[in-house]
Structures are given as C-alpha cells and as structure tokens.
C-alpha cells in the first residue's frame, strides 16, 4: 500500500504542504538514527476482508490470520514510538503514532485460535477440543481393529500387503482382487493394474461412520469459531480502517527517510523569493562514489544562469540536478546536498532535453529546441 502511495508521489507548490512533508521526513530520519527502522513486515491490504466481514461474511482461516498479523504490526509500530526520555518530541509523527488504536484483544484471540493459514487450534473452543479428542480416540480404535485383521491368520493370504491405508476418507486394507468375494468388506478403490482392491472390513464400518460424523461436527464447530472471529473483526472494523491508513502513511514516510539516509540527504531550506543555493549537490541517480558535486546559485545576485563547456563536461547533469532537487524538495524528499542548501518554490518545472527534431516540420535541431523554448516561455509566470 505504501508502494502505491510512493508511486503516486507528486510535488506541491503550497508552502504549507512542503513544510509538513519535509518535517515528517526529517523526524523519521532522526528516529531511524536513534531507534533503527520500524518493522512493517506482515502489513498487507486487508480491506477486502473487512468489507466481506461487515456484510456478515465468514472470513477464512488464512484471512483471519492476515488480520491477526496486521494487529501484531500495529502493536509493534505503536511500541516503536515509545519515548525513552521526555525530551524526545516528534511533533508530526507523534500525531500518527498516537492515533494508532491498539488491537491487542483481537490479535490475542486470533493468535489463540489460529495456528496457521490452514489450521485452527484445538483450544479455540472447548467443543472443538472435545470433538478432536473423540476423533483421535476413534481413529485409534479403528487402527487397532484393522491391525487385528492384518494379523489374523484367516485373512493373511487374502491381503496384498500388511498395511492400513485411507481411501475416500475411510480406513481400508489392500486385498488381492481374486478374494473380492471372500473378504467381508466394501470396495472403495483399486490399484492401476486392478490386482489390488482397497476394502473397508465390515467390522469397522460403524467406527468409520462414527469418525465421519465427528468430522462433520468438527467442521461445524470450526465454522462457529470463524464466525465469532469474523464478528470480532467487524466490531473492530473502524479501528482497523484507521490503523490501515496510519500505517500506510508511516510506512511511506519512513521509506522517504530510508531513501534520504541511503544518499546522505539533507532537508532543504525553501525560499518564497525563488532563490536557489545548492551546496555540493549530487545527482540522486548517479553513483555516489563517482558523481561530481556541484554548487549552484541562482536568483540572488543574478536571475539567469548560462552553463557552457565541452561535451560530457556535466552541463546536462547540472541542469537535471537542479530540476530534480526542485521536484524532490517540493515532494517532501530530502536532497543529496550539504545542509543549508536552499530551493525556490515553483508551480511548474519545464525542461528541453536532447534532440527532439521533427522530420515532419522539417526543422533543424536548433530550431526544434527554439520552438520548445518559446512554448515554455509562453507558459512561465514571471
């Protein structure tokens, strides 16, 4: 979810937005340096589950587990924000952390009842525990009886192998095909060659039926448990929705902080008079070990800057760096430059890069650029 938010990141020309976004990134960077990065692992989109639960739908075991994992992430992130001392103040981020609603009761109940994406715990309810105990005892009785059949001299020659197997959810033994009429039992399956029949002895049919009945009861009891947990999710839907939004925003903010930390970025100063003063700026997409830092000053002593020099001398990179810094800063990102660098605030950023010569209009490379520049000049506000 934070990934989608990052993909939709756009710069703002409103100073109020820029200040808030930059402060959020700065506070997150400070927290990462002091506490490490908070873990958002297990944080997944669960709105479809919430919607279905609110419509009296029953969530699956896997879906409930994902809700439980989300509640766990909420607790971890909330704990991450605990202050080690009273001097720690993160005005912007504390607003998000403080609004996270604890979901401990929901987390604990799901954790108690759900073992994995496919398994409900025996202790999820007293009824389920008793039913499974009966199933286990019935299985043992059937196996004991079938072991008696396998070891009986009366049936020894009729058996293809001395093992107990399951076919169609019924305990069976492998019987030689030629003894199908002699062995007292029901056929449930046969081998590919047809030489072996998997038969359920008549003496265990009632026991197998008992197991089937218990399994049906187990399924009903599990459904009751899932309904109760789904109702609990519905009861907490408002808090979960709010936490989803808060964690998405926090995940996004800390991603910006990690990005700033990776390229050793700094918070730029924004000047409403449009003055740019970049100190040792480094193009964010170039190898930090190879990139040549630049200093750019514009709008104070002079309002126009012409860059000249030989090919591959860094002219285009310098221009792109200024443009990217402007967009990054106004989107709330720190810039890879020394502390104290300043940027202006612009409603639009225009660029004419490369050879966009139009063959249809029969324009030269130079005139093609001039056409672009004239178009840009007609759109800018001075």
Where are these regions (language model features)?
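P-loop NTPase nucleotide-binding module
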Residues: 293-343, 369-370
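Flexible beta-alpha connector loops of hexameric P-loop NTPases
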Residues: 285, 308, 350-367
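N-terminal pre-Walker A segment at the start of P-loop NTPase domains
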Residues: 274-292
């Amino acid at each position: 979810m934070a990934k989608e938010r990052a993909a939709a990141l756009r710069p703002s020309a409103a100073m109020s937005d820029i200040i808030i976004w930059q402060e959020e990134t700065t506070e997150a960077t400070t927290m990462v340096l002091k506490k490490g990065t908070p873990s958002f692992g297990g944080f997944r989109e669960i709105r479809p589950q919430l919607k279905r639960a609110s419509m009296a739908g029953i969530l699956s075991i896997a879906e409930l587990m994902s809700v439980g994992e989300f509640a766990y992430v909420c607790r971890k992130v909330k704990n991450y924000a605990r202050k080690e001392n009273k001097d720690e103040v993160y005005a912007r981020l504390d607003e998000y952390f403080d609004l996270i609603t604890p979901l401990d009761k929901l987390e604990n109940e799901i954790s108690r009842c759900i073992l994995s994406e496919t398994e409900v715990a025996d202790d999820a309810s007293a009824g389920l525990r008793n039913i499974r105990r009966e199933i286990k005892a019935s299985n043992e009785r059937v196996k004991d009886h079938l072991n008696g059949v396998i070891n009986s001299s009366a049936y020894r020659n009729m058996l293809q192998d001395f093992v107990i197997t399951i076919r169609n959810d019924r305990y069976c033994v492998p019987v030689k095909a030629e003894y199908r009429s002699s062995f007292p039992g029901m056929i449930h399956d046969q081998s590919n060659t047809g030489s072996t029949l998997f038969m359920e002895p008549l003496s265990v049919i009632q026991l197998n039926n008992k197991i089937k009945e218990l399994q049906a009861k187990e399924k009903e009891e599990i459904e009751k448990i899932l309904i109760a947990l789904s109702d609990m999710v519905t009861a907490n839907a408002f808090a979960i929705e709010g936490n989803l939004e808060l964690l998405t925003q926090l995940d996004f903010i800390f991603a910006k902080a990690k990005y700033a930390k990776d390229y050793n970025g700094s918070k730029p100063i924004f000047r409403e008079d449009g003055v740019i003063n970049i100190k040792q700026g480094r193009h964010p997409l170039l190898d930090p070990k190879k990139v040549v830092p630049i200093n750019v000053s514009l709008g104070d002593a002079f309002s126009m800057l012409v860059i000249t020099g030989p090919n591959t001398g860094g002219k285009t990179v310098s221009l792109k760096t200024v443009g990217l810094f402007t967009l990054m800063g106004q989107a709330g990102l720190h810039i890879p430059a020394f502390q104290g660098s300043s940027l202006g605030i612009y409603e639009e950023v225009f660029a004419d890069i490369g050879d966009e010569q139009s063959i249809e209009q029969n324009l030269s490379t130079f005139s093609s650029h001039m056409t672009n520049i004239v178009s840009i000049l007609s759109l800018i506000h001075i």
